[in-house]
């Protein structure tokens, strides 16, 4: 599956956050959270300082919101994590990041650079341990989202969904079950499944990607859109309809 390295996904997300902010401020927030006073305020956050995209402030009370946007929820995925800092927490990922840096320094032809990065990516995914995977998921996905309200917007229909991340099956599995990488046809990505104490296999639609943030062209200096590119770890949510169905009564439309 192709993914954007030109900044268009980020720009689209910013537009969605602005529209969602206005929608919540005009009354949707009080419908979701009836205890809010008349003086509540929806504040734009995001950037490098905040995990939450939006924040509802009402006196001493705060509601943290992670906003996810899809044109069609039946197509594509959204990110739980897109981080270069997480690369430091596994020897396999460190080696991938070092390979990316080396390719950037030597600036070989595009195809040579792409092949080197893809090979390093596949090796990293194939060799990361279950222990490292669980540690990264706990630190960078569960902990950073456990107090978050997740809001999914489908722009083609105008539908919105809201749920608490700490009530989700994914959060429960990250905290209590064993994650495993399932290698398939993808070179730089794989599914992440979980096993419980009874050896039941649980699929929450989680995918891991080990890639560069701005693509190969930026890495070797041939891109006009970006001048640098580094190794990043992504966890993505596939199969959004299944996610919504699995939450059952814990998710609501607004």
Region roles according to the model:
Residues 3-11, 18, 26-28, 60-225, ...:
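Catalytic cores of nucleic-acid endonucleases
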Residues 225-254:
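Protruding loop/beta-arch "assembly-hinge" segments enriched in small, turn-prone residues
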Residues 26-59:
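A short acidic/basic microdomain associated with nuclease active sites
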Residues 1-2, 254:
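Non-Sec secretion/translocation targeting segments of pathogen effectors
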């Amino acid at each position: 599956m192709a993914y954007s390295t030109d900044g268009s996904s980020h720009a689209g997300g910013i537009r969605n956050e602005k529209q969602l902010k206005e929608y919540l401020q005009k009354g949707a927030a009080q419908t979701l959270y009836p205890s809010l006073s008349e003086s509540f305020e929806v504040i734009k956050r995001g950037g490098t300082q905040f995990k939450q995209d939006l924040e509802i402030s009402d006196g001493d009370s705060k509601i943290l919101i992670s906003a996810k946007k899809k044109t069609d929820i039946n197509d594509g995925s959204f990110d739980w994590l897109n981080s270069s800092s997480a690369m430091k927490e596994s020897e396999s990922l460190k080696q991938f990041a070092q390979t990316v840096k080396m390719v950037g320094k030597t600036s070989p032809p595009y195809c040579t650079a792409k092949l080197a990065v893809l090979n390093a990516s596949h090796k990293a995914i194939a060799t990361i341990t279950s222990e490292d995977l669980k540690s990264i998921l706990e630190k960078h996905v569960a902990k950073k989202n456990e107090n978050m309200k997740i809001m999914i917007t489908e722009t083609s229909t105008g539908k919105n969904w809201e749920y608490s991340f700490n009530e989700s099956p994914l959060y429960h599995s990250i905290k209590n079950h064993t994650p495993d990488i399932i290698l398939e046809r993808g070179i730089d990505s794989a599914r992440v499944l979980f096993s419980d104490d009874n050896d039941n296999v649980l699929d929450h639609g989680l995918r891991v990607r080990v890639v560069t943030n701005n693509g190969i062209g930026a890495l070797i200096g041939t891109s006009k859109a970006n001048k640098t590119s580094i190794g990043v770890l992504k966890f993505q949510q596939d199969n959004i309809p299944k996610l919504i169905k699995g939450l059952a009564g814990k998710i609501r439309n607004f």
